[in-house]
Amino acid sequence: MSIPSLDYRLFSHGDPAQRQQFCEDLVKTFAGYGFAKLRNHGLSDERVDEAFSYSNKFFNLPLHIKQKAKHPEAPNPHRGYSGVGQEKISAITGFEKGERSEVRAAELRESWDQGPADDELYANRWMPDEDLPGYRSFMESFFVECQTLHQSLLQCIATGLSLPSDELSSRCAKCSAELRLNHYPATPASSLASGACRISPHSDFGTITLLFQDSVGGLQVEDQQNPGVFLPVEPDDVHEMIINVGDCLSRWTDGRLRSVNHRVVSPTRLPGDADVMIPERHSLAYFGKPSRDEVVDSLPLFVPEGCKPKFADRWTALEYNQSKLMRTYNVETAAQG
């Protein structure tokens, strides 16, 4: 399986026919693969390089500095620095299928999370600016750039589905998205030999995820023709964006667009020697999400006449998000906010 690569410039600078074709191709790719590669997405190479530079600087800070903006042990607020092993994505493997394993595998990853600068429910957690000058200013502006692209892609999907262009983007008008920096420290291959992953198989919570990964590799996506088989998504270019469908968008479309399991393991090109050191890996992920009070059931317009909706439990986006966060941070209850 090879993830299709789409040229966003056909939409942003194309004629009406090219714009329509891009929208239809995006829908077709998301329906078949759940993932796509996106080039000419509008975030400049310089901005992406600067984001990776800040990620590297942040994670190289002494632990006591990073912990000035420490993520709480509880799920909320989902903000700030999480140390290696604090968040356990293995706890939500199979969540959408109703499979709730109690096995919480070791995951070799630390991360940083932030939300909108004006979020009244969950404030961001920042270190003093002198600890990493320019970090907060850059991250806040990069967040806005990602949000703008996210909304545009939702409009593309709606257009590709022959819906009003704001049918989906309007449901995300009050931003509750998150921007995450991930760092996977260098580790011996033997540390992944017993079933541990850099990040366990999971699907994303929200609408569309925008991802940049460095050149190390290790991202794998479940083959939709062969469930349980994971295939590598090798980075062609660190400036290329990988986008994928999240659970809420899949639910809205009654499963027409696929929210697909993915994971991060040892890069396939490395030898199988247990003594080999797997190099450190960085990724940047923007998790688009619905407005918190939006219901994330199947939308009636996607349910065939005479059929029952696949998703009809009346969860709001916030409730759905919390139901997964409570498991990843090993907490059984959390404030709904």
Curated annotation (Swiss-Prot):
Per the UniProt record, which EC number(s) apply here?
1.14.-.-
Q: Is-annotated flag, keyword Oxidoreductase? A: yes
The residues listed in the UniProt record as binding 2-oxoglutarate, with positions renumbered to this chain, are R281
- In its UniProt entry, the species of origin is given as Dothideomycetidae sp. (strain 11243) (Fungal sp. (strain No.11243))
Signal sequence bounds: none
Use in biotech settings? FR901469 inhibits the activity of 1,3-beta-glucan synthase from Candida albicans and Aspergillus fumigatus. With minimal inhibitory concentrations (MICs) against Candida albicans and Aspergillus fumigatus of 0.63 ug/ml and 0.16 ug/ml, repectively, FR901469 displays greater inhibitory activity than other 1,3-beta-glucan synthase inhibitors such as, WF11899A, echinocandin B, aculeacin A, and papulacandin B.
- Give the protein name, as stated in the record: 2-oxoglutarate-dependent dioxygenase frbA
- What induces or represses expression of this protein, per its UniProt record? Expression is positively regulated by the cluster-specific transcription factor frbF.
> Which GO terms fall under biological process for this protein?
small molecule biosynthetic process
- Names of the cofactor(s): Fe(2+)
Q: Which family does it belong to?
A: Belongs to the iron/ascorbate-dependent oxidoreductase family.
Sorted alphabetically, the keyword list is: Dioxygenase, Iron, Metal-binding, Oxidoreductase
Q: What are the residue boundaries of the Fe2OG dioxygenase domain, all occurrences included?
A: 175-290
Q: Taxonomy-wise, where does this protein's organism fall, top ranks first?
A: Eukaryota, Fungi, Dikarya, Ascomycota, Pezizomycotina
Function in brief:
2-oxoglutarate-dependent dioxygenase; part of the gene cluster that mediates the biosynthesis of the antifungal antibiotic FR901469, an inhibitor of beta-1,3-glucansynthase, exerting antifungal activity against the pathogenes Candida albicans and Aspergillus fumigatus. FR901469 is a cyclic depsipeptide containing 12 amino acid residues and a fatty acid chain. The NRPS frbI contains 12 modules responsible for the formation of the depsipeptide backbone which is denoted as Acyl-Thr-Ala-Tyr-Val-4OHPro-Thr-Thr-3OHPro-threo3OHGln-Gly-Thr-Orn-OH (C71H116N14O23).
> Binding positions for Fe cation?
H202, D204, H262
Q: What does the record note about the cofactor?
A: Binds 1 Fe(2+) ion per subunit.
Citing just one GO molecular function, the answer is:
metal ion binding
Does the record's keyword annotation contain Oxidoreductase?
Answer: yes
Q: Which pathway does the protein contribute to? A: Antifungal biosynthesis
